[in-house]
């Protein structure tokens, strides 16, 4: 997946991964 950001669709706080 890709790195997520505080404003991504997943609502990640710091860094998360999603596909």
Curated annotation (Swiss-Prot):
Residues 2-19 form the LCN-type CS-alpha/beta domain. InterPro entries: LCN-type_CS_alpha_beta_dom (IPR044062). Keywords: Secreted. Coiled coil: none annotated. The keyword Transmembrane does not apply. Its main location: secreted. GO terms for cellular component: extracellular region. GO terms for molecular function: ion channel inhibitor activity. It is found in: Secreted. Expressed by the venom gland. Belongs to the long (4 C-C) scorpion toxin superfamily. Sodium channel inhibitor family. Alpha subfamily. Not toxic to mice. Has the structural arrangement of an alpha-helix connected to antiparallel beta-sheets by disulfide bonds (CS-alpha/beta). This is Toxin Tb4. It comes from Tityus bahiensis.
């Amino acid at each position: 997946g890709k790195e997520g950001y505080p404003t991504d669709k997943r609502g990640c706080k710091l860094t998360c991964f999603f596909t």
